[in-house]
Amino acid sequence: MAEDDIKIVMFCCNWCSYGGADTAGTARMQYPTNIRVIRVMCSGRIEPQFVLKAFREGADGVLVTGCHHGDCHYDAGNYKLDRRMRLIYKLADELGIGRERIHHDWISASEGEKFAETVKMMVNRIKDLGPSPIKKQLAEA
């Protein structure tokens, strides 16, 4: 799969990981442009159906990022995300998407380099996996 064809949706917490994207940008760190960032107020607000809809709309992979444990602006949002991610990974496997197309990580506002490296890692992973199997199913329908 050509790197330019890869589409990744990235859910970013408003208070930390979105700030990490800003830090990466202001520091002029290089990372692939294959991501589409969706800012959410808290990673704990990310529902499984958001991730599934991203695949249904043509994403090849999904990144979910939030504050480190103990740093959540809303106290326990990242712990809620931990529980939801277990469900999301299970659903991805059961639906034939594959959990390897989804990654979640904790990125603070000061971790621009980690933001850029996480994006690069995900693009390389999706490049190796190829297009989402959901794309093929939708094309045949």
UniProtKB/Swiss-Prot annotation:
<dbReference type="Pfam" id="PF02662">
    <property type="entry name" value="FlpD"/>
</dbReference>
<keyword id="KW-0411">Iron-sulfur</keyword>
<dbReference type="GO" id="GO:0051537">
    <property type="term" value="F:2 iron, 2 sulfur cluster binding"/>
</dbReference>
<keyword id="KW-0001">2Fe-2S</keyword>
<dbReference type="GO" id="GO:0046872">
    <property type="term" value="F:metal ion binding"/>
</dbReference>
<keyword id="KW-0408">Iron</keyword>
<keyword id="KW-0813">Transport</keyword>
<protein>
    <recommendedName>
        <fullName>F420-non-reducing hydrogenase iron-sulfur subunit D</fullName>
        <ecNumber>1.12.99.-</ecNumber>
    </recommendedName>
</protein>
<comment type="similarity">
    <text>Belongs to the MvhD/VhuD family.</text>
</comment>
<comment type="subunit">
    <text>The F420-non-reducing hydrogenase is composed of three subunits; MvhA, MvhD and MvhG. It forms a complex with the heterodisulfide reductase (hdr).</text>
</comment>
<keyword id="KW-0479">Metal-binding</keyword>
<keyword id="KW-0249">Electron transport</keyword>
<comment type="function">
    <text>Part of a complex that provides reducing equivalents for heterodisulfide reductase. MvhD may form the contact site to heterodisulfide reductase.</text>
</comment>
<keyword id="KW-0560">Oxidoreductase</keyword>
<dbReference type="InterPro" id="IPR003813">
    <property type="entry name" value="MvhD/FlpD"/>
</dbReference>
<dbReference type="GO" id="GO:0016491">
    <property type="term" value="F:oxidoreductase activity"/>
</dbReference>
